[in-house]
Amino acid sequence: MSDKPNAVSSHTTPDVPEVAATPELSTGICAGDYRAALRRHPAGVTVVTLDSGTGPVGFTATSFSSVSLEPPLVSFNIAETSSSINALKAAESLVIHLLGEHQQRLAQRFAGSADQRFADESLWAVLDTGEPVLHGTPSWMRVKVDQLIPVGDHTLVIGLVTRVHAEEDDESAAAPLLYHEGKYYRPTPLGQ
């Protein structure tokens, strides 16, 4: 037990670090335990970009997933508190960039301050359809926003893929960038 006032002890298991107690969620589970469990799940890193009508908007997302092959649908979600949420809700289309291991700084840039995301104009260009596209990304997809579904404190975005681009040069063909336990990683194959 801690000597600090209002401290609450949490349970631990031998292989899991102790998580600071936090308020319970509506289901009765501890928010800190829930976050700790999700941190154990690695995710691919994407950057979503779009044209807001008044300039480019973008953000890092690790919730990207394929939904359907026919029609080609993908999804990701965004917090209702995101600085990009209003522009996203107004957008008809966007670009989802699947980042490579060489793009950790780009992932960090788009997870940081909104006013710095597009500050370096050498990192991006504009497609003929108006969306910003990032240079050197292993692959990206132009997506027409199909559905915006409010889910809890997030919005689930379902998009119809209208264009796919894959880079062929050696650097862009690198392994994907992963996010796990608050850090960036590259995948390595397991022994066969």
Swiss-Prot record:
Q: GO cellular component terms? A: cytoplasm
Supply the EC number(s).
1.5.1.42
Subcellular location per UniProt equals: Cytoplasm
Query: GO:BP terms for this protein?
Result: dibenzothiophene catabolic process; pyrimidine nucleobase catabolic process
- Keyword Nucleotide-binding assigned to the entry: answer is yes
- Applied use: Can be used to remove sulfur from polycyclic aromatic sulfur compounds found in gasoline and diesel (biodesulfurization), which are a considerable source of pollution. As the substrates are not very soluble in conventional media, biphasic systems may help improve catalysis. Expression of dszD-dszA-dszB-dszC (cloned in this order) in organic-solvent-tolerant P.putida strain Idaho allows P.putida to grow on 10% p-xylene with DBT as the sole sulfur source.
From what superkingdom does this record's organism come?
Bacteria
Report residue spans for region: Disordered.
Answer: 1-20
One Pfam short name: Flavin_Reduct
| Function of the protein | An NADH:FMN oxidoreductase which supplies reduced FMN for the '4S' desulfurization pathway that removes covalently bound sulfur from dibenzothiophene (DBT) without breaking carbon-carbon bonds. Provides DszA and DszC (DBTO2-monooxygenase and DBT-monooxygenase respectively) with reduced flavin (FMN).
Family label: Belongs to the non-flavoprotein flavin reductase family.
* Name of the protein: NADH:FMN oxidoreductase
